[in-house]
C-alpha cells in the first residue's frame, strides 16, 4: 500500500531534520570534544538520514519506477551499514565497560553507543523503505506489462 502525501512529507521532514542533527554532532564532537568515535557515528547517522531523505524524495517524484535496481542497491547499502552499526555499538560498549567510563562524560564511549544505535536505526529504515518502495513499484510494473 502506497503511503499518503502527508506521510511522505513527514518522513522527509524527519529525515531532513535528522541529517542536520547528525552532521552537527559530527562537527561538534570533532572540533569541540575531539571524540572521533561519537563524531564518526553521528556523521554516519547524518549520511544515512540524508540517504533516506533522498529515497523519499525520489519516491515522491516517481523516479524509482524506471530504476528498480537502484532500490535494490539502497537495500543492500542499508543492510551493510546495519551490520557496521551493530558491530560499532558492541565495540563501543565493550570499550566503555572495560575502561570504566562515566555515563555523563561527553567524551565517553557510551555516547558513541547511542549514536551507533541511531546509525543502525537509519540504516534499518533505509533498507525498510527501499524494500517497501521496490515492492510497491514492482506491483505496478507487473500490472503495466499486461
Curated annotation (Swiss-Prot):
Q: Name one GO cellular component term.
A: cytoplasm
The organism encoding this protein is Mus musculus (Mouse)
Q: What is the lineage of its organism?
A: Eukaryota, Metazoa, Chordata, Craniata, Vertebrata
The name this protein goes by in its record: Heme transporter HRG1
Q: Which gene encodes it?
A: Slc48a1
Residues spanned by motif Di-leucine motif: 142-143
Similarity section: Belongs to the HRG family.
Give the bilayer topology: Multi-pass membrane protein
**Localization in the cell:** Endosome membrane; Lysosome membrane; Cytoplasmic vesicle, Phagosome membrane
Q: Where is the signal peptide?
A: none
Catalytic activity field: heme b(in) = heme b(out)
Amino acid at each position: 500500500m502506497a503511503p499518503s502525501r502527508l506521510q511522505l512529507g513527514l518522513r522527509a521532514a524527519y529525515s531532513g531534520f535528522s541529517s542536520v542533527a547528525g552532521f552537527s554532532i559530527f562537527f561538534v564532537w570533532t572540533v569541540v570534544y575531539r571524540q572521533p568515535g561519537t563524531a564518526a557515528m553521528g556523521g554516519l547517522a547524518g549520511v544515512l538520514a540524508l540517504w533516506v531523505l533522498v529515497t523519499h524524495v525520489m519516491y515522491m517524484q516517481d523516479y524509482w519506477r524506471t530504476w528498480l535496481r537502484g532500490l535494490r542497491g539502497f537495500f543492500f547499502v542499508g543492510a551493510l551499514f546495519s551490520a557496521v552499526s551493530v558491530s560499532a555499538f558492541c565495540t563501543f560498549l565493550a570499550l566503555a565497560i572495560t575502561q570504566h567510563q562515566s555515563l555523563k562524560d561527553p567524551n565517553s564511549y557510551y555516547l558513541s553507543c547511542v549514536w551507533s544505535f541511531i546509525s543502525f536505526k537509519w540504516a534499518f529504515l533505509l533498507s525498510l523503505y527501499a524494500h517497501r518502495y521496490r515492492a510497491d513499484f514492482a506491483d505496478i510494473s507487473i500490472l503495466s506489462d499486461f
